[in-house]
Structure formats: structure tokens, C-alpha cells
């Protein structure tokens, strides 16, 4: 729904790894499934999510070399010759449109079957599932294939894991695209002091209000323009703060 629930400034001499725990502390996560970019695949972050009675689905890349190596090796062996005898779940979706076919396939393995093959298993609180997601995009003149690996605290349900990974990228694309198109965020040159964070906060508040206002049958960009020249509509937008 493109709502922004929280925001934390990343210090100039730091990165998102230190900012994410601060953000998790201020959010009510109970009962939710949390997805984060690969930088957020950290044992401390996974522990915080579980401690708040939530679940996680986290991408595993080479910033976690042992974890990435073990998971990729497990799925490679399963794909080639079933050297490791592990039950797994699988789910596939096929979408057609805009001149292409997108096939997404997910395989998941439950912890009871992989924990002896994962050297860092005990470091990840709540870890129940490892997953491999393959995205195949078929265009008129070429085929693109991308493979990603994940750890998850949810049970080994390939459909649920695949849905979580798709939802994550949907939020990324919709939110960032709207902020860029409707608010021209990428063109902002505000750098001094807390200016960048302050303006980002204002953009997020405005986006939340415009997203919640449902009477105007147009996109966020046009809603923003309408609020600028129509005071009656502006009051409708502001009334969504309640």
C-alpha cells in the first residue's frame, strides 16, 4: 500500500547495518514477516525480529560467505545428482505481459534436513528454512536467469517464501518509483545538516497521506498537483492524518 512506517538516518561514517536495528526497535512487528536487503542479513537483526515475535525472510549473498557457500552447495547438489537426500518443497509462478514471460521458481528445505550441512546454523535465531529462488525472464531475443538464496524463520513453505520475496521487490519498486516520479526525489540536492533527512520525512508523510486519500481517481503525481491548486482537495488529503 506504499505506506512508510518509519525512517532512520544513516550516519555519514556508518551504514544501514547500524541503522536497521534502530528502526526495528520503533516498529510493532508482532505477527509480521520482515524482509530486508542482503545488507540486513545479520545474526543480530534476525535475533531482534524473532524477539519481537515476527518472522524474517532474508536474502543471502557473499557478504555472508560461509552461509552463502553452504546454502548454494546444498542446492547445487540437490539439482545435479541428489547427493544429499533432503525432502524439499517447490512452487512456481508464471506471469506474461509487456512482451515477456517471467517464471519464478522457489525451492525450500526445512531445518531438520539441512542443519548438519550449515556451519553457522546455530548463529541464526529462529532459522527454519533455506530457500533458492530462480527468476527466469524470457524476452523476444534473449533469456535472463537470476538465482538467489534466502534464510527464513517461517516453515518450509515454498509458496509463502516466494510470495515474501516478490512482495519485497514490489515494495522497493513501487515506493522508490513513486518517490522519484511524483516527488522527483533523485533530483534533490539538499545535503546540508539534517536537510536531506527532513525533506525525506516530509516526502514520506506526503506520500502516506496521498496514498490514503481515495476520492481522486488518479495517480500520486496528479494527486499532488491537484492538492497544490485545489484547497478543498488539499483539506481532504490532510484529513487523512486522523
Q: Language model features by range: what are they?
A:
Residues 46-54, 76:
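Short, surface-exposed basic-aromatic patches at helix termini and helix-loop junctions that form
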Residues 155-190:
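Short amphipathic alpha-helical "interface-anchor" segments enriched in bulky aromatics
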Residues 1-36, 41-44, 216-219:
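Conserved, well-structured functional cores that handle cations and Mg-NTP chemistry
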Residues 2, 20, 33-41, 56, ...:
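Short, conserved catalytic/metal-binding motifs centered on acidic residues
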Residues 61-166:
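An anionic, glycine-rich sequence signature occurring as long contiguous blocks
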Amino acid at each position: 500500500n506504499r505506506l512508510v512506517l518509519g525512517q532512520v538516518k544513516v550516519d555519514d561514517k556508518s551504514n544501514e547495518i547500524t541503522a536497521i536495528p534502530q528502526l526495528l526497535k520503533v516498529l510493532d512487528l508482532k505477527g509480521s514477516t520482515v524482509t530486508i536487503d542482503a545488507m540486513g542479513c545479520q545474526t543480530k537483526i534476525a535475533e531482534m525480529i524473532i524477539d519481537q515475535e515476527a518472522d524474517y525472510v532474508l536474502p543471502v549473498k557473499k557478504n555472508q560467505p560461509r552461509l552463502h557457500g553452504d546454502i548454494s552447495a546444498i542446492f547445487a547438489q540437490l539439482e545435479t545428482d541428489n547427493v544429499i537426500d533432503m525432502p524439499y518443497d517447490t512452487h512456481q509462478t508464471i506471469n506474461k505481459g509487456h512482451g515477456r514471460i517471467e517464471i519464478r521458481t522457489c525451492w525450500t528445505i526445512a531445518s531438520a534436513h539441512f542443519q548438519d550441512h550449515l556451519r553457522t546454523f546455530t548463529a541464526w535465531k529462529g532459522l527454519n528454512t533455506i530457500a533458492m529462488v530462480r527468476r527466469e525472464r524470457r524476452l523476444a531475443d534473449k533469456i535472463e536467469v537470476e538465482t538467489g538464496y534466502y534464510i527464513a524463520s517461517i516453515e518450509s513453505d515454498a509458496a509463502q517464501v516466494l510470495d515474501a520475496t516478490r512482495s519485497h521487490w514490489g515494495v522497493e519498486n513501487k515506493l522508490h518509483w513513486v518517490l522519484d516520479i511524483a516527488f522527483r526525489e533523485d533530483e534533490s540536492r539538499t545535503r546540508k545538516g539534517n536537510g536531506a533527512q527532513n525533506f525525506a520525512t516530509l516526502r514520506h508523510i506526503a506520500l502516506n497521506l496521498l496514498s490514503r486519500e481515495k476520492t481522486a481517481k488518479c495517480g500520486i503525481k496528479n494527486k499532488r498537483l491537484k492538492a497544490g491548486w485545489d484547497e478543498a482537495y488539499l483539506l481532504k488529503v490532510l484529513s487523512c492524518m486522523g
